[in-house]
Amino acid sequence: MAAAADLAQIPDVDIDSDGVFKYVLIRVHAVSPPGTPAGESKEIVRGYKWAEYHADIYDKVSGEMQKKGIDCECLGGGRISHQSQDKKIHVYGYSMGYGRAQHSISTEKIKARYPDYSVTWADDGY
């Protein structure tokens, strides 16, 4: 069974270094025995250029988490524009399948991972 320490080992943010790509906001939590309260959880951001669909990212991440004994749920998706040369990241849009992620949460996570970047978000666009 996964513990809070296992959650701490999971990076909050893993996104590609350049380009415009899809991303998902995922809540990960330790699997708790039936009838017991849910354990600790946290949100993670994952975004990759290789993903044609938001579900491609979630399927890959959820498979990796299950192997570690960690449950997860997709909270929504969107797009990320990452310009590493200009140190800019913009989070926007939504996922047709999962709906719009709370970009404000994603942005806070990204700001912590890239403290010297200008990180912005908007609910518009696709």
Curated annotation (Swiss-Prot):
What positions constitute the catalytic site?
H54
What protein am I looking at? Answer: 14 kDa phosphohistidine phosphatase
Q: Which domain of life is it from?
A: Eukaryota
What Pfam families does its record include?
A: Ocnus
BP-aspect Gene Ontology terms = positive regulation of cell motility
Organism of origin = Sus scrofa (Pig)
Q: Which residues make up the binding site for substrate?
A: K22, S95, M96, G97
Query: What are the alphabetically sorted keywords of the record?
Result: Cytoplasm, Hydrolase, Protein phosphatase
Q: What class of enzyme is it?
A: hydrolase
The answer, when asked if Hydrolase is one of the entry's keywords, is yes
Instruction: Quote the SUPFAM superfamilies the UniProt record gives.
Output: PHP14-like
Q: Which family does it belong to?
A: Belongs to the janus family.
Q: What does this protein do?
A: Exhibits phosphohistidine phosphatase activity.
User: What Gene Ontology cellular-component terms does the record carry?
Assistant: cytosol
Asked if Hydrolase is a keyword of the record, the answer is yes
EC number of this enzyme: 3.9.1.3
**GO molecular-function term, one example from the UniProt record:** protein histidine phosphatase activity
Which reaction does this enzyme catalyse, per its entry? N(pros)-phospho-L-histidyl-[protein] + H2O = L-histidyl-[protein] + phosphate; N(tele)-phospho-L-histidyl-[protein] + H2O = L-histidyl-[protein] + phosphate
Q: Where found in the cell?
A: Cytoplasm
Q: How does it assemble?
A: Monomer.
Where mainly found? cytoplasm
